[in-house]
Amino acid sequence: MLGLDSHADISCAGRDAHILAQTEGRTCTVHLFNDSYDPMTGIKIINVLYKYENTEGGQYILEVNQCLDFTVTIVRSILCTNQVQHTGIIVNDVPKVCNPTSSQDIRVDDGKTVTTLEMNGPIPYLPISKPSINDVEYLPRIKMTADDIDWDPHKIFNQPHLSEYKYLKQDFDISYNIQGVDIYHLPYHHLKYLILLI
């Protein structure tokens, strides 16, 4: 399962991810929501691939670049909504039960490719599986997040003009924020993580 998270600052790769590459020279420190736990250090940043099959039976490879490497420790993967939208992809994640006019999907290439979002309770998601070598080689690929710029949402979205955007420093920290909606649930050892790039 590749769950969408609009409060996440960066995507997280779980066990269904096929690792494409590791981003050299960049690691993260992940702080738990509770100060009594030690932070997780040296978390790698990787580019990964997932296999996705839409409701019509079409199969694709989803390429998610610049995500945290939890491929050994978590089952479900997380897709940062704004990280996807920053590439120009349209994310319509309002559930139809809340708004019957919602398309509840992700639209790529000006709507030419549509991936329908399913719901797991309140969480929109894409059903995924780990791709085989044959899948990786022959299935059409959709690039969900960019690999040509360093992902730093605070610099990107907090700048008054996007032209002022600067590349992310080599090492950065993932920290926590205990104010209300910034709570970010990461299913690792059943603990809650609050992830914010600083």
Region annotations inferred by a language model:
Residues 24-29, 39-198:
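Aspartic protease core domain of the pepsin/retropepsin superfamily
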Residues 2-7, 11-13:
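Short hydrophobic beta-strand that contains or immediately precedes a catalytic carboxylate
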Residues 8, 17, 83:
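Catalytic histidine site
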Residues 32-35:
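Acidic/polar residues in short coil/turn loops that connect beta-strands
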Residues 1-2, 96:
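Beta-strand elements of modular eukaryotic interaction domains
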Residues 15-26:
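A glycine- and small-aliphatic-rich helix-loop capping segment at beta-alpha/alpha-beta transitions
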Residues 12-16, 87:
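Short hydrophobic alpha-helical segments that form membrane-spanning helices or hydrophobic packing faces
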